[in-house]
Swiss-Prot record:
Subcellular location, principal: host cell
Assembly information from the UniProt record: Interacts with movement protein TGB3. TGB1-TGB3-TGB2 complex formation is enhanced by ATP hydrolysis.
Cytoplasmic compartment residues: 1-11, 94-204
Role, per record: Participates in the transport of viral genome to neighboring plant cells directly through plasmodesmata, without any budding. TGBp2 and TGBp3 are necessary for intracellular delivery of TGBp1-containing vRNPs to plasmodesmata. Can gate plasmodesmata and increase their size exclusion limit. To a lesser extent than TGB3, induces host actin cytoskeleton network thickening, which probably plays a major role in virus cell-to-cell movement.
Misc remark: This protein is translated as a fusion protein by episodic readthrough of a termination codon. Readthrough of the terminator codon TGA occurs between the codons for Gly-131 and Ser-133, thereby producing TGB2' minor translational readthrough protein.
Organism annotation: Barley stripe mosaic virus (BSMV)
Ranges annotated as spanning the membrane: 12-32, 73-93
Topology in the lipid bilayer: Multi-pass membrane protein
Subcellular localization, as worded in the UniProt entry: Host cell junction, Host plasmodesma; Host endoplasmic reticulum membrane; Host cytoplasm, Host cytoskeleton
Membership in a protein family: Belongs to the virgaviridae/benyvirus TGB2 movement protein family.
Full protein name: Movement protein TGB2
A single cellular component GO annotation: host cell endoplasmic reticulum membrane
Amino acid sequence: MKTTVGSRPNKYWPIVAGIGVVGLFAYLIFSNQKHSTESGDNIHKFANGGSYRDGSKSISYNRNHPFAYGNASSPGMLLPAMLTIIGIISYLWRTRDSVLGDSGGNNSCGEDCQGECLNGHSRRSLLCDIGXSFYHCSMAIVYISKQYTYGDWSLLLSRSELCEDLWNRGYEPRSYCGHPPLAEVPFWGISDVGRFNQCFEYSS
């Protein structure tokens, strides 16, 4: 005889629905306040401040904030804001070469460019910058041998260790501006040689 156990009904959904309905009504009540037009003694209230005097009774109201009732926009600030934005864009455009490494409009790199055209950055710092994720390489982890003599290539190195090791063996990241012929990998221990060749070149 086959026995099936039914799923337990969810008894919390009415509570959640009730809290949602009450919260919705509370939001509508507090967000749709009617503007009071009369005081407790039936003296008219001015919509935007002012004062009222009737015999011995006098009442005064503070004026509304200048930004009230849709007056928050300031047309007089449009021109200064536009000039500020134009100034920032102009500054970034003029300094793009120092940021992009002379690759934004004034590219003087030749076919033999090995990375010298990147202003302000040494090739070693580019190679060993972990945050650059191996320059533009999509390779996350590479297996490389630390003990080349014994052929122990199963050792997993961190990216910083791999950067230092590749630099010491004469490798540099490929440059964006020029694609010199890539050298063959002269040692054991590289996993996925094709992806390695897309990222580094032998320069020494």
